[in-house]
Amino acid sequence: MPTRHATSGRLLYAQSGGVTAVINATAAGVIEAARARGVPVYAARNGILGALREELIDTRKETRAAVAALRHTPGGAFGSCRYKLKSLEANRAEYERLIEVFRAHDIRWFLYNGGNDSADTALKISQLGKAMKYDIRCIGVPKTVDNDLAVTDCCPGFGSVAKYTAVSTLEASLDVASMASTSTKVFILEVMGRHAGWIAAAAGLAGDGADAPPHLILFPENVFDEAAFLAKVKATVERVGWCTVVASEGIRNAAGQFLADAGTRDAFGHVQLGGVAPTLAELVKGKLGYKVHWALPDYLQRSARHLASRVDAEQAYAVGKAAVACALAGMNAVMPAIVRTSDAPYRWKIEAAPLAKIANREKKLPKGFIRKDGFGITAAARRYLAPLIAGESAPPTKNGLPVYVQLKNVAVAKKLAPWPPG
């Protein structure tokens, strides 16, 4: 007998992995779209862990104004986590616990807002729901500053970190140029991007031409060549008087080792990186004798809502609304993907894409986006990147500071035994 498609029940929304400057805009899109359809929305506290622990938040307790303010508030309003569910075969009990929580609270739609691993989780839950004959519609909602999700043209969160990176590169370069005659000759900016160089590439928007910063971009898609790197830095300083380098955290040597491998791994099994910028700085100082300054923006690059891209904020909100539309239309195991229809003028739309084509896949920077010398971006990369950082989306301010919302996050009463048991 086929599983009945639910026409009533609750929607559960959860945030996963590293947060962004605009992930809360997606949350606002989800809540507002669901409210418009009369569907109650619960949020999982701290991502999938909240669902497992039955730590749910009733968003109906939030005012319309508070939900609207999420559109300009960075961070994750309901909390996020780095917790990867194992395979169904390795730990079926966790997935069954999720279905148990869903059943107890009449959750009929599950929206998981994250990256590659989150898409995989949503896909697996949809499969188990069918196996357990529980009617649950699972939708992956795109989010990652790394911009490495397959199928979608870009990922909400990326446009804003790209803008932050380009602006920081431009402004820091003006500082270095001012000091170069008697002080710092080389500035190194380390940006996120373990395997894909999208964020590093965005630094290239800061300038164009042989002598414009950044003078070198180091991509994880390329093998790091120490001799070529040092030669390029030396030639740039001798010609321009100073040099700006932007390096992805994930660059590797010819042996395949991360330059900044700290020897530890996170909850997703990813290698923890200890710092490319200081490693490169020591190399330049030791081999070339130049004074070097380096910077690691870390969380700053993904939380700078004051410098968010308007396009990014709009897309983040739109995928939230589209995810609800997909779920309530009865779709399952899909993700609302952004489709570019034109570069100039920039136009885009949203289409549902199967999670099976997204889960655990990684979209790296195309070879055609990296200059032949390996240290810069091409015109094709500029055409792709430029629209994504366009427009301003500044939050309201008071006394010189941005005004951000803090939700009530009222807990839903638990109905089940604690997890993990015992």
Regions found by a protein language model. Give the residues of each.
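N-terminal phosphate-binding or glycine-rich loops at protein starts, especially the Walker A/P-loop
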Residues: P2-E55
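Short glycine-rich or small-residue beta-strand-to-loop segments that form or flank ligand, phosphate
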Residues: R10-T20, G76-R82, R108-G114, V186-V191, ...
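Short, ordered loop/turn segments at secondary-structure junctions
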Residues: S16-G18, A44-L49, R82-Y83, G115-N116, ...
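Short glycine/serine/threonine-rich phosphate/pyrophosphate-binding segments
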Residues: T20-V30, A51-L52, E94-E96, N116-K124, ...
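C-terminal non-catalytic interaction/assembly regions of soluble proteins
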Residues: F258-G422
